[in-house]
Every structure is written in C-alpha cells, then in structure tokens.
Swiss-Prot record:
GO terms for biological process: cell redox homeostasis; cellular response to oxidative stress; glutathione metabolic process. It is found in: Cytoplasm; Mitochondrion. The active site is at H465 (proton acceptor). Belongs to the class-I pyridine nucleotide-disulfide oxidoreductase family. Keywords: Cytoplasm, Disulfide bond, FAD, Flavoprotein, Mitochondrion, NADP, Oxidoreductase, Redox-active center. The gene is GLR1. This is Glutathione reductase. NADP(+) binds at A198, I201, E204, R221, R227, G287, E333, V368. It comes from Candida glabrata (strain ATCC 2001 / BCRC 20586 / JCM 3761 / NBRC 0622 / NRRL Y-65 / CBS 138) (Yeast). Its EC number is 1.8.1.7. Its main location: cytoplasm. Disulfide bonds join C54-C59.
Length: 476
C-alpha cells in the first residue's frame, strides 16, 4: 500500500499523480521522462525555466562563452600558421561584440527550453510552472506564475530543486557584486573584472573574461586554484593563468567592497591590504547551497549540517516515498550524475523487475574544467590514493610535453598527464590531465577506468598518432 498515511487528502486536491517531481533541472526532467515512459502518471513542477542551472545559467551557456574565448585566443595564432593579414590579430586588436553575442546565446538557450518542454509533453509528462511547497497535509501546493494556487497529491515525490550561489554576507558591500548566475545577465563586457573563488566556476569565468580581453583578476584564499583536484591540475592551471596575464591574488580574500556613486566603479579591498580600483564587475563564485524553502519541515525530511537533503544510495530520504537527487542532496554535483541518478530512480520505482535494485555508482565519475587549457579528472587524486592504499602500494606515471599544435607557436600552452595505479596488477585508480581537448579525451578513458582497466590495458592499446591522447597509452 503506497503512502496513503503520509499523503492524506485534507485540502482540496486538483489532481493525483503516480509521480510528482519538484524541479525541472537535469535530474528532474530525466527522472520524470523515464517514469512517464513506463506509464506512470507524472507531474513536473518548475519555478523558472526548464533545464535548471545547467541549461540556463551553467554548463551550456558557459561552454558557449568558452568557445568564444577560446576562438579569440586561437585567432591570434593565425599569423604563426602562415595566414597573412594586413595587421596580425592580437588580444588588443580583437573586439568582441558582447551584447550581440549575448542575444544569440540567449536565443539558443530559449530554444533548448522549448525542446525540453516538447520532449516532456511527448513522453506524457504534465508540466506546471510555479513554486512548489509541501503543505501540512503532505500534499504539494503550487503557486503558479499567474498567482493562482493548486494542490497536488502523489504516491511518490522527487525533490530535485537544485542549488543557488553562495554570497559572503559578512563582507561589507557584498551586495555590490553579482554571482555566476548574474554573469549571464551582463549586458556589456566589463573592462575590469574581479572573480572571487578558486573552484571550477571561478576559474572558468576568469579564463573566459581574459580570453575576450577583459582585465581579469582572480582572488583565491590558497596558493592554488582547483584545490579539490590533483596537484598536477592545481599547479599547472594556476601557473599558466599567472603566465597568461590573469592577475591571481593568492592567499587573500575580500575585506570590503565600495562603490563610487559618480562613476559606478567598485573598489575591492583585499585582506592583504591591496585595493583593486576601477572595477566594473565583481563576481562571487564561492560555491553553491541547496535550494530549499519548499516546506520539507512539514513532512519531516531530514537535512545534514550543510542543509542538504540526506539520502541513501537509492536516493531515498528518511520519509517513505519521498526521494531526492542532484545538487539539493549534495552528492556529486554534476549534470550527467543527476541525469543518471534520475533515470535509475525511475527504473527502480516504475520499471520492470530487473531494475528493482537499480542505483547509481558514484565512484569513478569523470569531471572536467573548461579552463584555459582544459583539465579533466577521474578517480582518486594522488593524495587520496596514498591515504586509501598506502604509498608503497601505488605507482604514479606522469608526462609533461608540448602538444603538436603549439610547435608552430612561440607561446606554448602546457600539457600534463598523470596516471595513478594501485597494487601489483597496476589497476588504474586515477587519471588527471591538463591540455587541449582534455574533456573529449577523458570521456573514452573514463569508460576504461570504470571497467577496471590496468596500466597493461592502456599499454596494449595501439596509439593514435599524432595526438596528445596517445601519451596516455605510451607512458612509461
């Protein structure tokens, strides 16, 4: 018998569903579509635009901006490849039409929103736009965009509300800055920008701004960026950003922010005493927190000390027939992870018997950073491998070289690879790469590592020449 005790009807209910999904991001959309494909009567509720962070203010528009920035850099290489112009292109001579490009980018995202909605409808998912909240009856009350209210009940409910950016609210003047969401609302390219944060979001945005010609400043608390990644990635990206001319302010933080009301410019005061003057935009990229405020207390769903929904390996919360996944539950916060978890959850809940124990394996999840150059990682860092297996039980292979593309160029971009192996069979437990096309390279090697590949398996693969990736199967 399915949760009639929990979802009792004590308020007028518009409709009852087999499955109700709160949040139309990557995980919610994937789970609702999969459930509907099995015949479940499914409702998806979204407060803003379909696709969530990834499609609207994350992966997709960010990658579009990265392409523009990367192309701007490569255009300056043209004359070194024999492509003559009257005036050789340089970062100073290239102009980027930010407002016009923003229109094209936003139109592309709008098309994707429509594709998401059409795909949901094709699968038979009902979509309601509005803000959902559990009421004290255990049902879901939705305030729609026209300010009308509907109440829905369901046998099973998924919470996939995602996350939102964190602000340093104790810093005087913090509100003068924006966040990574606000980056996509900028109508003009800032001449001078300060990005605060050493995580992948800050690194990507600082790189984009620099590539497009902005005077870019990056403020980090430690000595390196990307501190959750292996040291080969931390050191290579940090050093190259400095070499490229990004102003990396290390071992400091923002003390206060002031605004000149006449010019609109900001003064960003750092804790090391330095003041960054005439700043056009300040962007906080200090992490994200779960997007809550949906009445979880009314149904008793428990949170951890980071205010993330606690789930087990099957995405179950502590309340029967309420589930959670994606950023709001604090697991691996990546779009493909949420999609995979959402599909597996619906397989288990609504699919055939063979999927009754379906769950996502959160180990060996590949991730990339669209820095300049790109970085990719899967498995354990070297420090993690030492802690897990002991230093004497691991072997580390590294390679440092210049990709062929840069052989014709005076200014070289680094390529660094590291393979971490464990035990006498040298099972590959970690792979960390920095260099052009790292994201594309890592996808294939991710399959191999997920299957338990050893160093011998890598060695037995015939190399593709000439490529950078061949180094991974010829490394000694």
């Amino acid at each position: 018998m399915i949760v009639k005790r929990l979802f009792r009807t004590m308020a007028p209910v518009a409709k009852h569903f087999d499955y109700l999904v709160i949040g139309g991001g990557s995980g919610g959309v994937a789970s609702s579509r999969r459930a509907a494909s099995y015949g479940a009567k499914t409702l998806l509720i979204e407060g803003k635009a379909l696709g969530g962070t990834c499609v609207n203010v994350g992966c997709v528009p960010k990658k579009v901006m990265w392409y523009a920035s990367d192309l701007a850099t490569r255009l300056t290489h043209a004359h070194e490849y024999g492509l003559a112009q009257n005036v050789p292109l340089s970062k100073e001579s290239i102009t980027f039409n930010w407002p016009e490009f923003k229109k094209k980018r936003d139109a592309y995202i709008h098309r994707l929103n429509g594709i998401y909605e059409n795909n949901l409808k094709k699968e038979g998912v009902e979509v309601v736009f509005g803000w959902a909240k559990f009421n004290k009856d255990g049902n879901v009350e939705v305030t729609k965009h026209d300010n009308t209210t509907e109440v829905y009940s369901a046998d099973r409910i998924l919470v996939a509300t995602g996350g939102k950016p964190v602000y340093p609210e104790k810093v005087p003047g913090f509100e003068l800055g924006t966040d990574s969401d606000g980056f996509f609302r900028l109508e003009e390219q800032p001449k001078k920008v300060v990005v605060v944060g050493a995580g992948y979001i800050g690194i990507e945005l600082a790189g984009v701004f620099h590539g497009l010609g902005s005077d870019s400043h990056l403020v980090i608390r430690g000595k390196t960026v990307l501190r959750k990644f292996d040291e080969i990635i931390q050191n290579t990206v940090t050093d190259y950003y400095v070499e490229e001319g990004i102003n990396v302010h290390k071992e400091t933080n923002v003390d206060k922010v002031e605004k000149d009301e006449k010019t609109g410019k900001l003064s960003v005061h750092l804790t090391n005493g330095q003041v960054l003057e005439d700043v056009d935009e300040l962007i906080w990229t200090m992490g994200r927190r779960s997007l809550l405020g949906i009445g979880l207390e009314n149904v008793g769903v428990k949170l951890n000390d980071k205010e993330q929904i606690i789930t087990d390996e099957y995405q179950n919360t502590n309340v029967p027939n309420i589930y959670s996944l994606g950023d709001v539950s604090g697991r691996v916060e990546l779009t493909p992870v949420a999609i995979a978890a959402g599909r597996k959850l619906s397989n288990r809940l609504f699919g055939p018997e063979q999927y009754r124990n379906d769950k996502l394996d959160y180990t060996n999840v590949p991730s990339v950073v669209f820095s300049h150059p790109e970085a990719g990682s899967i498995g354990l860092t070297e420090d993690e491998a030492i802690k897990q297996y002991g230093k004497d039980n691991i072997k580390v292979y590294t390679s440092k070289f210049t990709a062929m593309y840069y052989a014709m160029l005076e200014h070289k971009s680094p390529t660094r690879y590291k393979i971490i192996c464990e035990g006498p069979n040298e099972k590959v437990v970690g792979l960390h790469i920095v260099g052009d096309s790292s994201a594309e390279i890592l996808q294939g090697f991710g399959v191999a590592i997920k299957m338990g590949a050893t160093k011998a398996d890598f060695d037995n693969c015939v190399a593709i020449h000439p490529t950078s990736a061949e180094e991974l199967v010829t490394m000694r």
